[in-house]
Amino acid sequence: EFALFKGHRYATVVADADTQQVLWVGEGRSRAAFRPFFTWLGPEGCAAIESVAMDMNTAFDLEVREHCPQAQVVYDLFHVVAKFGREVIDRVRVDQANQLRDNPKSRQVIKRSRWLLLRNPENLPAGHDVRLSELLEANQPLNTVYVMKTALKELWYAPTEQEASQRWNDWYRQSQES
């Protein structure tokens, strides 16, 4: 999906991942907006779909599962890492800040660290890498979730399905232990 205008009117693009050919474009990102693609494709076309890569839009997910139940759904790296950041890193950061109510200076450092923790290291402004290192050295729970975020990204770069599966199992085990 992509924004058509600044006012957040969206369009949905369906492309063949093998050929990179655009197959269909529709206005909107709701189930109703996406459904005409499956009508156009027909039952035989839907049955031929093996996998679908998409963002974590619930409407897309529900439509794909309804029309192509055999298809493997793969969520894109950006949205998975963003969700991990919102739901895990932010939760740990807020919890850590709340534990420091008696130390306002340290609490403020953690409260103001959101973007430092969520940004990719290569996108940090000059000098912020030192701040990040100091923060992670001083706070083990934040360090743990930051390392887990980095390892989560590596799942998408596995050279083989077997390696991806092994990385997933390792990541999941580590997440349960931390």
Regions flagged by a language model, labelled:
Residues 5-8, 16-20, 27, 35-36, ...:
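Acidic/histidine-rich catalytic cores and adjacent linkers
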Residues 10-13, 85-96:
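Short, surface-exposed amphipathic charged segments that create phosphate/polyanion-binding patches used
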Residues 70-86:
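Inter-helix linker motif
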